[in-house]
Amino acid sequence: PPHQCFRRQRQMCIRDRKFVFGQDSAIDALTQAIRRARAGLRQEDKPIGSFLFAGPTGVGKTEVAKQLSKTLGLELIRFDMSEYMEKNAVARLIGAPPGYVGHEQGGLLTDAIIKNPHCVLLLDEIEKAHLDIFNVLLQVMDNASLTDSTGRKADFRNVILIMTSNVGSENIGSQSIGFSNNVSDIGSGALDKTFRPEFRNRLDKIVKFKALSVEIVER
Protein backbone atom coordinates (compact mmCIF):
# COMPACT_ATOMS: atom_id res chain seq x y z
CA PRO A 1 0.00 0.00 0.00
CA PRO A 2 1.21 3.56 -0.69
CA HIS A 3 1.12 4.69 2.95
CA GLN A 4 3.27 1.72 3.96
CA CYS A 5 5.77 2.48 1.18
CA PHE A 6 6.27 6.06 2.32
CA ARG A 7 6.54 5.02 5.96
CA ARG A 8 9.21 2.50 5.02
CA GLN A 9 11.09 5.15 3.09
CA ARG A 10 11.10 7.40 6.16
CA GLN A 11 12.37 4.51 8.25
CA MET A 12 15.14 3.63 5.82
CA CYS A 13 17.59 6.31 6.96
CA ILE A 14 17.11 5.39 10.62
CA ARG A 15 17.42 1.66 10.00
CA ASP A 16 20.50 1.90 7.78
CA ARG A 17 22.35 4.08 10.27
CA LYS A 18 21.98 1.33 12.88
CA PHE A 19 23.93 -1.08 10.68
CA VAL A 20 26.19 1.21 8.63
CA PHE A 21 28.32 3.83 10.36
CA GLY A 22 29.85 7.00 8.96
CA GLN A 23 27.90 7.00 5.69
CA ASP A 24 25.06 9.40 6.49
CA SER A 25 25.52 11.47 3.32
CA ALA A 26 25.46 8.36 1.11
CA ILE A 27 22.33 7.02 2.80
CA ASP A 28 20.60 10.41 2.53
CA ALA A 29 21.43 10.65 -1.19
CA LEU A 30 20.04 7.17 -1.84
CA THR A 31 16.89 7.80 0.17
CA GLN A 32 16.13 11.06 -1.63
CA ALA A 33 16.64 9.47 -5.04
CA ILE A 34 14.27 6.60 -4.22
CA ARG A 35 11.65 8.99 -2.84
CA ARG A 36 11.74 11.00 -6.06
CA ALA A 37 11.36 7.86 -8.13
CA ARG A 38 8.47 6.51 -6.08
CA ALA A 39 6.73 9.88 -6.09
CA GLY A 40 6.29 9.50 -9.84
CA LEU A 41 9.19 11.69 -10.90
CA ARG A 42 10.61 9.05 -13.20
CA GLN A 43 9.88 7.65 -16.62
CA GLU A 44 7.57 4.66 -16.66
CA ASP A 45 9.81 2.59 -18.91
CA LYS A 46 12.80 2.65 -16.55
CA PRO A 47 13.68 0.87 -13.29
CA ILE A 48 12.68 2.52 -10.00
CA GLY A 49 16.30 3.60 -9.67
CA SER A 50 19.73 2.79 -11.06
CA PHE A 51 22.57 3.49 -8.65
CA LEU A 52 26.33 3.05 -8.53
CA PHE A 53 27.78 2.72 -5.02
CA ALA A 54 31.43 3.79 -5.19
CA GLY A 55 33.88 3.48 -2.33
CA PRO A 56 36.54 1.36 -0.62
CA THR A 57 36.04 -2.22 0.49
CA GLY A 58 34.41 -2.71 3.86
CA VAL A 59 32.58 0.60 4.26
CA GLY A 60 29.00 -0.69 3.96
CA LYS A 61 28.03 -0.56 0.27
CA THR A 62 26.62 -4.09 0.19
CA GLU A 63 25.11 -3.75 3.67
CA VAL A 64 23.15 -0.65 2.64
CA ALA A 65 21.65 -2.60 -0.26
CA LYS A 66 20.68 -5.44 2.09
CA GLN A 67 19.06 -3.10 4.60
CA LEU A 68 17.26 -1.28 1.81
CA SER A 69 15.66 -4.51 0.62
CA LYS A 70 14.59 -5.39 4.17
CA THR A 71 13.16 -1.94 4.86
CA LEU A 72 11.12 -1.89 1.65
CA GLY A 73 10.12 -5.54 2.01
CA LEU A 74 11.69 -6.51 -1.30
CA GLU A 75 13.65 -9.58 -2.34
CA LEU A 76 17.41 -9.06 -2.66
CA ILE A 77 18.96 -10.64 -5.75
CA ARG A 78 22.75 -10.52 -5.73
CA PHE A 79 25.33 -11.33 -8.40
CA ASP A 80 29.09 -11.20 -7.83
CA MET A 81 30.37 -9.76 -11.10
CA SER A 82 33.87 -11.14 -10.54
CA GLU A 83 32.31 -14.40 -11.77
CA TYR A 84 31.29 -12.76 -15.06
CA MET A 85 34.59 -11.53 -16.46
CA GLU A 86 34.63 -13.73 -19.58
CA LYS A 87 32.89 -12.97 -22.87
CA ASN A 88 30.58 -15.98 -22.54
CA ALA A 89 29.34 -14.62 -19.19
CA VAL A 90 26.48 -12.82 -20.93
CA ALA A 91 25.02 -16.18 -21.93
CA ARG A 92 24.88 -17.17 -18.27
CA LEU A 93 22.84 -14.07 -17.44
CA ILE A 94 20.35 -13.99 -20.34
CA GLY A 95 20.67 -17.51 -21.75
CA ALA A 96 22.72 -19.22 -24.42
CA PRO A 97 21.99 -18.53 -28.12
CA PRO A 98 20.09 -21.13 -30.18
CA GLY A 99 22.21 -24.16 -30.95
CA TYR A 100 24.32 -23.87 -27.81
CA VAL A 101 24.14 -26.01 -24.69
CA GLY A 102 21.66 -24.63 -22.17
CA HIS A 103 19.60 -22.64 -24.68
CA GLU A 104 16.33 -23.99 -23.28
CA GLN A 105 17.19 -23.02 -19.70
CA GLY A 106 17.14 -19.24 -20.04
CA GLY A 107 19.50 -17.01 -18.05
CA LEU A 108 20.23 -16.55 -14.35
CA LEU A 109 19.42 -12.84 -14.36
CA THR A 110 16.29 -12.96 -16.48
CA ASP A 111 14.93 -15.97 -14.59
CA ALA A 112 15.48 -14.22 -11.26
CA ILE A 113 13.65 -11.06 -12.36
CA ILE A 114 10.78 -12.99 -13.93
CA LYS A 115 10.29 -14.83 -10.63
CA ASN A 116 10.77 -11.69 -8.48
CA PRO A 117 9.73 -8.61 -10.51
CA HIS A 118 9.69 -6.46 -7.34
CA CYS A 119 13.21 -6.62 -5.95
CA VAL A 120 16.54 -4.99 -5.22
CA LEU A 121 19.09 -6.19 -7.79
CA LEU A 122 22.65 -5.98 -6.46
CA LEU A 123 25.60 -6.35 -8.84
CA ASP A 124 28.75 -6.41 -6.72
CA GLU A 125 32.09 -5.20 -8.15
CA ILE A 126 30.55 -4.17 -11.44
CA GLU A 127 33.89 -2.91 -12.81
CA LYS A 128 35.03 -6.56 -13.12
CA ALA A 129 32.20 -7.53 -15.47
CA HIS A 130 32.90 -8.13 -19.16
CA LEU A 131 32.18 -5.19 -21.47
CA ASP A 132 29.33 -7.07 -23.15
CA ILE A 133 27.49 -7.13 -19.82
CA PHE A 134 27.52 -3.33 -19.76
CA ASN A 135 25.63 -3.38 -23.07
CA VAL A 136 22.99 -5.53 -21.39
CA LEU A 137 22.79 -3.08 -18.48
CA LEU A 138 22.31 -0.18 -20.90
CA GLN A 139 19.25 -1.99 -22.25
CA VAL A 140 17.93 -2.49 -18.71
CA MET A 141 18.45 1.14 -17.69
CA ASP A 142 17.03 2.44 -20.97
CA ASN A 143 13.91 0.31 -21.38
CA ALA A 144 13.54 -1.64 -18.11
CA SER A 145 13.17 -4.88 -20.04
CA LEU A 146 15.34 -7.75 -21.15
CA THR A 147 14.46 -10.69 -23.38
CA ASP A 148 16.20 -13.99 -22.70
CA SER A 149 17.30 -16.59 -25.22
CA THR A 150 13.91 -18.36 -25.08
CA GLY A 151 11.94 -15.22 -25.88
CA ARG A 152 10.66 -14.52 -22.37
CA LYS A 153 10.72 -10.88 -21.32
CA ALA A 154 11.95 -9.82 -17.88
CA ASP A 155 10.33 -6.60 -16.60
CA PHE A 156 12.66 -4.32 -14.59
CA ARG A 157 10.19 -1.46 -14.01
CA ASN A 158 9.77 -2.40 -10.34
CA VAL A 159 13.45 -3.15 -9.73
CA ILE A 160 15.95 -1.03 -7.79
CA LEU A 161 19.27 -1.62 -9.55
CA ILE A 162 22.35 -1.17 -7.36
CA MET A 163 25.91 -1.70 -8.58
CA THR A 164 28.95 -1.47 -6.32
CA SER A 165 32.49 -0.54 -7.31
CA ASN A 166 35.87 -0.17 -5.61
CA VAL A 167 37.27 1.93 -8.44
CA GLY A 168 39.45 4.75 -7.13
CA SER A 169 39.64 3.42 -3.58
CA GLU A 170 43.43 3.35 -3.77
CA ASN A 171 43.36 7.14 -4.01
CA ILE A 172 41.59 7.64 -0.70
CA GLY A 173 44.48 6.83 1.59
CA SER A 174 47.60 4.77 2.06
CA GLN A 175 46.30 2.72 4.99
CA SER A 176 44.47 -0.59 4.79
CA ILE A 177 41.67 -0.77 2.27
CA GLY A 178 38.47 0.67 3.70
CA PHE A 179 40.13 2.56 6.55
CA SER A 180 41.82 5.94 6.24
CA ASN A 181 42.19 9.25 8.01
CA ASN A 182 41.28 10.93 4.73
CA VAL A 183 37.47 10.92 4.70
CA SER A 184 37.02 12.97 1.53
CA ASP A 185 34.85 11.55 -1.23
CA ILE A 186 36.34 9.53 -4.03
CA GLY A 187 37.31 11.71 -6.97
CA SER A 188 35.33 11.23 -10.11
CA GLY A 189 38.43 10.84 -12.30
CA ALA A 190 38.83 7.10 -11.73
CA LEU A 191 35.12 6.49 -12.30
CA ASP A 192 35.20 8.50 -15.53
CA LYS A 193 38.12 6.43 -16.82
CA THR A 194 36.52 3.10 -15.91
CA PHE A 195 32.90 3.61 -16.94
CA ARG A 196 31.83 4.91 -20.33
CA PRO A 197 29.81 8.15 -20.53
CA GLU A 198 26.74 6.38 -21.93
CA PHE A 199 26.75 4.15 -18.84
CA ARG A 200 27.27 6.95 -16.31
CA ASN A 201 24.64 9.15 -17.93
CA ARG A 202 21.96 6.51 -17.43
CA LEU A 203 22.55 6.25 -13.69
CA ASP A 204 20.12 8.05 -11.41
CA LYS A 205 22.86 8.63 -8.86
CA ILE A 206 26.49 7.81 -8.15
CA VAL A 207 26.47 7.36 -4.37
CA LYS A 208 29.96 7.86 -2.97
CA PHE A 209 30.96 6.12 0.26
CA LYS A 210 33.72 7.56 2.42
CA ALA A 211 36.60 5.69 3.99
CA LEU A 212 36.03 4.95 7.67
CA SER A 213 37.77 7.13 10.22
CA VAL A 214 39.46 5.67 13.30
CA GLU A 215 36.65 7.05 15.48
CA ILE A 216 34.00 5.24 13.45
CA VAL A 217 35.94 1.95 13.48
CA GLU A 218 36.28 2.07 17.27
CA ARG A 219 32.52 2.32 17.83
Predicted regions and their residues:
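Short, exposed "boundary/linker" segments that immediately precede the start
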Residues: P1-H3
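AAA+ P-loop NTPase nucleotide-binding core of proteostasis motors
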Residues: R7-Q11, R15-R219
